[in-house]
């Protein structure tokens, strides 16, 4: 059995409130109901190989 995915934090495009969503949740701000959410930037190092 796979471990449960961690909830991801999103920022509302209207009011700026942070929202934590899990898979299957409605993509909507919990404060104002706005439907455009932006994913927060990850803290881990992301490195790609250039060719």
Swiss-Prot record:
Predominant cellular place of this UniProt entry's protein: nucleus
GO biological process, one term: DNA-templated transcription
UniProt keyword annotations, A-Z: DNA-directed RNA polymerase, Metal-binding, Nucleus, Transcription, Zinc
Binding locations of Zn(2+): 12, 15, 29, 32
Localization annotation: Nucleus
Listed Pfam families: Zn_ribbon_RPAB4
Gene3D superfamilies from the UniProt entry: RNA polymerase ii, chain L
Name of the protein in its database record: DNA-directed RNA polymerases II, IV and V subunit 12
């Amino acid at each position: 059995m796979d471990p449960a995915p961690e909830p991801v934090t999103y920022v509302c495009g209207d009011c700026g409130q942070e929202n934590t969503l899990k898979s299957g949740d409605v993509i909507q701000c919990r404060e104002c109901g706005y439907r455009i959410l932006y994913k927060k930037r990850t803290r881990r190092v992301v490195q790609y190989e250039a060719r």
